[in-house]
């Protein structure tokens, strides 16, 4: 009886202590503008995940720890508020006018977000600069509703294909119009450093794109670069270093050579049972699995006809060591380094402002043979002339070098597809029957293209060798210049004249090795492509 009384006392004491550790807080949240209750406002204990939301009457009830001192109340479009913990609270939330007063860039200049009636979305430069992308088109991925971006290549510096509000035509181009600092841009977006971006604005509907006519039928992406600033000159330097690695792992396929031999033996045996019977098919399949079917025996010290035990269908226990350790699922892929350095300076007086930047990017892909390098520079100057006139200029230069690893189509020269489909028994390099590497007359390691031992899969193909031996390099020099004149008079009347001159010079080299691959039958092939284009634009608003 005493023990029962003691246990009951401990239980009641524990309940009392538990109740003493929390405090119930109730209250209501209403709008300061119209005194209406706010439905779905968030009430959270500061520094924790303990919280609740208001009901249809704007009321809430929350058990908070006795150590809690502050509650954070927030709602979309309202200013967040912090209040002390009390048993009963009445909270007024005010509208956050800053959201509505945000200025956005549109086709005809700039406007307040609250007064804009078209369909447009903006990604700020601060968000873009947090993304580790070499091409600013990749920054739109998942950032804006109604914008779809796809990329058929994982090569650093490759641009994404952009679709705004779906496909508008089955025969014409689907790409949106790119406008940089008020003027259409025909160059590569990978030539623009993400550190020079002030904002990206996507215009989605016909009203927003009307200024550009038919060219804006697929939507418009307006790129605004960082502008000059008044005040004391400020220098900013940023250095980044990191690594690129394969994010999506290979599919679940057989990677163990012994398991692959056993499954192929079973398949080979089953195909012979109807004509030879089970015992005969088992014996024949084990005797001829290598010589008549797979051609390659990866295991050292085990004869081709003794690799599989026909009685059990299992691998010979003596098959414990490999003649080669090449791994198609790993060897073509390696972590690449990514380093980026940017420096800029901005400042000026009330009438004259300037901005200058210099950047370097080296981005090695995780696939052998893929790399992107960029050197960029930009100078921007704005000058007020009197009270009503303002002029400015913007000159940018970029030198880019992009190396790609090969084919992205669904064929044997696609490194991703090949490495996913080839069996784990086939090597990357060429070995003799004893497992020794073979070399050419110049002392270079030879690659296995499947012709030496009649490989049954993808004869004359080795995409890793092709990626290493082929040359696919694109060198570009882009020079973009922008100038404007802006006149303000008659109160709200503004006249703007934009002029631009762009030069795009490309030097592309493509060489396909004669030692194997698609060009082996013609002794290799190569070409150089050196187009140069220039654009002169003049726009007035």
Feature-to-residue mapping (PLM):
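Short, small/polar-rich motifs associated with maturation and membrane association
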Residues: 1-378, 383-398, 412, 464, ...
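A ubiquitous, low-specificity "background" feature that marks scattered single residues
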Residues: 8-9, 37, 61, 187, ...
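Short glycine-enriched loops at secondary-structure junctions
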Residues: 109, 450-452, 502-503
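Asparagine-centered polar/low-complexity signal
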Residues: 218, 462, 539-541
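Short, flexible, mixed-charge acidic loops at enzyme active sites
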Residues: 235, 453-454, 512-516
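Acidic/polar loop-and-plug regions of large Gram-negative outer-membrane beta-barrel proteins
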Residues: 313, 320, 398, 404-478, ...
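Small-side-chain secondary-structure face that scaffolds active or pore-lining regions
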Residues: 314, 365-376, 382-384, 394-409, ...
